[in-house]
Amino acid sequence: MEYSTFGRHVAVDTWGVQFDLLNDAEFLKKEMIEAAEACGATVLSVQAKQFSPQGATVLVLLSESHLSIHTYPERGFAALDCYTCGETVDPQIAIDYLVSVLKPEKTYAKKLVRGLGELQVVEPEMKLVEAAK
Protein backbone atom coordinates (compact mmCIF):
# COMPACT_ATOMS: atom_id res chain seq x y z
CA MET A 1 0.00 0.00 0.00
CA GLU A 2 1.31 3.43 -0.92
CA TYR A 3 0.61 6.39 1.36
CA SER A 4 0.32 10.06 0.41
CA THR A 5 2.97 12.44 1.76
CA PHE A 6 0.36 15.22 2.06
CA GLY A 7 0.05 16.80 5.49
CA ARG A 8 -1.28 19.89 7.25
CA HIS A 9 0.56 21.69 10.04
CA VAL A 10 -1.18 24.37 12.12
CA ALA A 11 0.90 26.52 14.49
CA VAL A 12 -0.72 29.03 16.84
CA ASP A 13 0.67 31.48 19.37
CA THR A 14 -1.88 32.42 22.03
CA TRP A 15 -1.51 35.44 24.32
CA GLY A 16 -3.53 36.63 27.28
CA VAL A 17 -4.39 33.18 28.64
CA GLN A 18 -5.24 32.75 32.32
CA PHE A 19 -2.19 31.70 34.40
CA ASP A 20 -3.91 28.75 36.09
CA LEU A 21 -4.93 27.16 32.78
CA LEU A 22 -1.37 27.28 31.48
CA ASN A 23 0.22 26.06 34.70
CA ASP A 24 -1.64 22.75 35.01
CA ALA A 25 -0.04 19.94 32.99
CA GLU A 26 -2.72 17.41 33.97
CA PHE A 27 -5.56 19.72 32.87
CA LEU A 28 -3.75 20.42 29.59
CA LYS A 29 -3.11 16.70 29.05
CA LYS A 30 -6.83 15.94 29.44
CA GLU A 31 -7.82 18.74 27.04
CA MET A 32 -5.16 17.76 24.50
CA ILE A 33 -6.52 14.21 24.39
CA GLU A 34 -10.05 15.61 23.93
CA ALA A 35 -8.77 17.86 21.11
CA ALA A 36 -7.06 14.94 19.35
CA GLU A 37 -10.20 12.82 19.61
CA ALA A 38 -12.36 15.73 18.39
CA CYS A 39 -10.46 15.81 15.10
CA GLY A 40 -10.61 12.04 14.70
CA ALA A 41 -6.94 11.38 15.41
CA THR A 42 -5.66 8.19 17.03
CA VAL A 43 -3.76 8.86 20.28
CA LEU A 44 -0.75 6.55 20.68
CA SER A 45 0.84 8.09 23.78
CA VAL A 46 0.96 11.26 25.85
CA GLN A 47 3.85 12.89 27.70
CA ALA A 48 3.25 15.78 30.10
CA LYS A 49 5.82 17.78 32.04
CA GLN A 50 5.02 20.31 34.77
CA PHE A 51 7.93 22.75 35.17
CA SER A 52 8.99 24.58 38.31
CA PRO A 53 8.30 27.30 39.22
CA GLN A 54 5.72 27.37 36.38
CA GLY A 55 5.00 26.19 32.87
CA ALA A 56 4.05 22.96 31.17
CA THR A 57 4.67 20.98 28.02
CA VAL A 58 2.36 18.31 26.69
CA LEU A 59 3.10 16.17 23.65
CA VAL A 60 0.46 13.87 22.18
CA LEU A 61 1.86 11.31 19.76
CA LEU A 62 -0.75 10.54 17.14
CA SER A 63 -0.88 7.73 14.63
CA GLU A 64 -1.26 10.60 12.14
CA SER A 65 1.64 12.67 13.67
CA HIS A 66 1.55 14.96 16.75
CA LEU A 67 -0.17 17.65 18.85
CA SER A 68 1.83 19.79 21.30
CA ILE A 69 1.60 22.72 23.69
CA HIS A 70 4.35 24.66 25.44
CA THR A 71 3.26 27.21 28.05
CA TYR A 72 4.69 30.27 29.75
CA PRO A 73 2.01 31.10 32.34
CA GLU A 74 3.90 34.11 33.68
CA ARG A 75 3.55 35.67 30.21
CA GLY A 76 0.03 34.37 29.48
CA PHE A 77 1.51 32.60 26.45
CA ALA A 78 1.07 29.17 24.91
CA ALA A 79 2.47 27.78 21.66
CA LEU A 80 0.17 25.19 20.05
CA ASP A 81 1.21 22.92 17.23
CA CYS A 82 -0.60 20.15 15.35
CA TYR A 83 0.63 18.25 12.31
CA THR A 84 -1.32 15.45 10.66
CA CYS A 85 -0.47 13.30 7.68
CA GLY A 86 -3.06 12.43 5.06
CA GLU A 87 -6.52 13.74 4.25
CA THR A 88 -8.69 12.17 6.95
CA VAL A 89 -7.67 14.07 10.12
CA ASP A 90 -7.87 17.88 10.11
CA PRO A 91 -5.44 19.45 12.62
CA GLN A 92 -7.43 22.70 12.57
CA ILE A 93 -10.23 21.00 14.52
CA ALA A 94 -7.84 20.10 17.37
CA ILE A 95 -6.38 23.62 17.40
CA ASP A 96 -9.84 25.23 17.40
CA TYR A 97 -10.86 23.04 20.33
CA LEU A 98 -7.80 24.06 22.37
CA VAL A 99 -8.18 27.76 21.57
CA SER A 100 -11.80 27.51 22.75
CA VAL A 101 -10.59 25.98 26.04
CA LEU A 102 -7.78 28.50 26.60
CA LYS A 103 -9.80 31.60 25.61
CA PRO A 104 -6.79 33.78 24.69
CA GLU A 105 -7.07 37.52 24.20
CA LYS A 106 -5.01 37.25 20.97
CA THR A 107 -4.03 34.49 18.57
CA TYR A 108 -1.53 34.42 15.73
CA ALA A 109 -1.78 31.40 13.44
CA LYS A 110 -0.28 29.91 10.30
CA LYS A 111 -1.08 26.74 8.42
CA LEU A 112 1.48 24.88 6.36
CA VAL A 113 0.53 22.48 3.60
CA ARG A 114 3.34 19.94 3.48
CA GLY A 115 4.43 16.90 1.51
CA LEU A 116 3.53 18.19 -1.95
CA GLY A 117 6.82 19.88 -2.84
CA GLU A 118 7.43 23.46 -1.77
CA LEU A 119 5.77 24.32 1.55
CA GLN A 120 2.58 26.35 1.19
CA VAL A 121 1.79 28.85 3.95
CA VAL A 122 -1.87 29.83 4.32
CA GLU A 123 -3.99 31.71 6.85
CA PRO A 124 -6.07 29.20 8.79
CA GLU A 125 -9.75 29.80 9.48
CA MET A 126 -10.02 29.83 13.27
CA LYS A 127 -13.37 28.71 14.70
CA LEU A 128 -14.47 28.66 18.32
CA VAL A 129 -15.90 25.29 19.29
CA GLU A 130 -17.84 24.14 22.33
CA ALA A 131 -15.33 22.40 24.58
CA ALA A 132 -16.41 19.35 26.56
CA LYS A 133 -16.94 19.96 30.27
Curated annotation (Swiss-Prot):
Cofactor, how bound (note): Binds 1 pyruvoyl group covalently per subunit.
Location of the active site: S65, H70, C85
Pathway the protein acts in: Amine and polyamine biosynthesis; S-adenosylmethioninamine biosynthesis; S-adenosylmethioninamine from S-adenosyl-L-methionine: step 1/1
PTM note: Is synthesized initially as an inactive proenzyme. Formation of the active enzyme involves a self-maturation process in which the active site pyruvoyl group is generated from an internal serine residue via an autocatalytic post-translational modification. Two non-identical subunits are generated from the proenzyme in this reaction, and the pyruvate is formed at the N-terminus of the alpha chain, which is derived from the carboxyl end of the proenzyme.
GO molecular function terms listed in the Swiss-Prot or TrEMBL record: adenosylmethionine decarboxylase activity
Annotated positions for site Cleavage (non-hydrolytic): E64, S65
Record-listed Pyruvic acid (Ser) modification sites: S65
Record keywords, A-Z: Autocatalytic cleavage, Decarboxylase, Lyase, Polyamine biosynthesis, Pyruvate, S-adenosyl-L-methionine, Schiff base, Spermidine biosynthesis, Zymogen
A GO CC term assigned to this protein in UniProt: cytosol
Main EC class the enzyme belongs to: lyase
Cofactor(s) of this protein: pyruvate
E.C. number(s) listed in UniProt: 4.1.1.50
UniProt GO BP: spermidine biosynthetic process
Source domain of life: Bacteria
Catalysed reactions, semicolon-separated: S-adenosyl-L-methionine + H(+) = S-adenosyl 3-(methylsulfanyl)propylamine + CO2
Similarity field: Belongs to the prokaryotic AdoMetDC family. Type 1 subfamily.
Record note on quaternary structure: Heterotetramer of two alpha and two beta chains arranged as a dimer of alpha/beta heterodimers.
Functional summary from the UniProt entry: Catalyzes the decarboxylation of S-adenosylmethionine to S-adenosylmethioninamine (dcAdoMet), the propylamine donor required for the synthesis of the polyamines spermine and spermidine from the diamine putrescine.
HAMAP family found in the cross-reference section: AdoMetDC_1
Name this polypeptide is given: S-adenosylmethionine decarboxylase proenzyme
Source species taxonomy: Bacteria, Bacillati, Bacillota, Bacilli, Bacillales
